[in-house]
Amino acid sequence: MAAETGAITVGEYGRSHCEAHKEPLTRDDLLLIGAAQQAMIAAASEWAGPLLLTDTDALMTAAWCEMLLGERPQELMQAPKADLYLLLEPDLPWIDDGTRFFSDPADRHRFATIVAQALVDAGVPFIRIAGQGHERLAAARAAIGAMHV
């Protein structure tokens, strides 16, 4: 979507962290991941146009922390938020890429529920995106297009 919209994208720091450290994530790791992700977003937003696409942010890291450790740190919940969140439903096949978690569909659905509740608790706008291939991409395009950026 970035290519067709001209948007700047911010990748996922957590993936790099997990690839480098290969250890089970701790609370301190997740706080670091959230802070690093927010720093990447802040840096990109300085020169991005009206649309900045981010893979994740501190709010999503808070949801990860809840899933993995049973707590949602306020430090992460209080970080700046995006204008819109696309909540991707866990309706695609799971692919093991070496860092991906939760191969069990029940765990994936539980995580989606945790994310949805974190979004509600944070009071941010979000749209659920489901479907396969072009259907999923079209739904994401429509959600972003409705923002009139």
Question: Where are the regions that the model predicts?
Answer:
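Conserved substrate/cofactor phosphate-moiety recognition/catalytic segment
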Residues: A2-A42, A140
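A generic structural signal for alpha->beta connector loops
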Residues: G6, P50, G123-P125
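Anionic group-transfer/hydrolysis microenvironments
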Residues: Y13, T56-L59, E89-D91
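Conserved protein kinase catalytic core
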Residues: H17-C18, T61, I95
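Conserved nucleotide-sensing/catalytic segment adjacent to the nucleotide-binding pocket
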Residues: E23-G70
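Secondary-structure boundary motif
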Residues: A43-W47, D121, A146-V149
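A glycine- and Lys/Arg-enriched "phosphate-lid" helix/loop adjacent to the NTP-binding pocket
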Residues: L69-E135, A139-R141, H148
